[in-house]
């Protein structure tokens, strides 16, 4: 068994959450450990549909949060729904800045669809229904270009 010592930020997992944590830790040194090549041992790459966020002038995080709480039939914490809805537009724009090829209209704005219990068109899609794969490819590319992140693929941890 190989023992390694590291005094930076350790991120375990190569899905969207792990990749996002590695990027957010900048400028601290990060070691990201994944049991498989990035994006292959996670469910993030399989996600379909799109990302819901209040991105249009006719929408707002408050409206998005209200729709989420109503659709949750009593199971959604209103405070957490409000936080996620408030952070959503920035998160989608950040993913787009990483290169996620969200569908756009002729003016370059996000092409949004209205789905499920959403009261407004707020689902930003990628190539119709390939959001997970395309978003992961963009975020993986950003991680690989980040000098502060060391990626260890095909590794397993047996203890901390």
Predicted regions and their residues:
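A short, basic/flexible loop-to-alpha-helix module at the beginning of a structural domain
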Residues: 1-6
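N-terminal Rossmann-like FAD-binding beta1-loop-alpha1 element of flavoenzymes
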Residues: 8-32
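Conserved N-terminal/central alpha/beta ligand/cofactor-binding core
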Residues: 35-159
């Amino acid at each position: 068994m190989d023992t390694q010592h590291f005094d930076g930020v350790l991120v375990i997992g190569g899905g969207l959450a792990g990749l996002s944590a590695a990027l957010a830790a900048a400028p601290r040194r990060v070691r990201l450990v994944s049991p498989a090549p990035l994006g292959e041992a996670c469910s993030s790459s399989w996600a379909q549909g799109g990302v819901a966020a209040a991105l249009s002038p006719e929408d707002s995080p408050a409206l998005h949060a209200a729709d989420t709480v109503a659709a949750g039939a009593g199971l959604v914490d209103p405070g957490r729904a409000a936080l996620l809805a408030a952070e959503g537009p920035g998160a989608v724009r950040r993913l787009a800045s990483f290169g996620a090829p969200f569908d756009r209209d002729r003016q370059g704005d996000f092409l949004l669809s209205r789905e499920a219990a959403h009261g407004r068109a707020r689902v930003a899609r990628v190539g119709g229904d390939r959001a997970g794969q395309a978003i992961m490819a963009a975020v993986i590319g950003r991680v690989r270009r980040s000098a502060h992140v060391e990626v260890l693929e095909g590794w397993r941890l047996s203890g901390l």
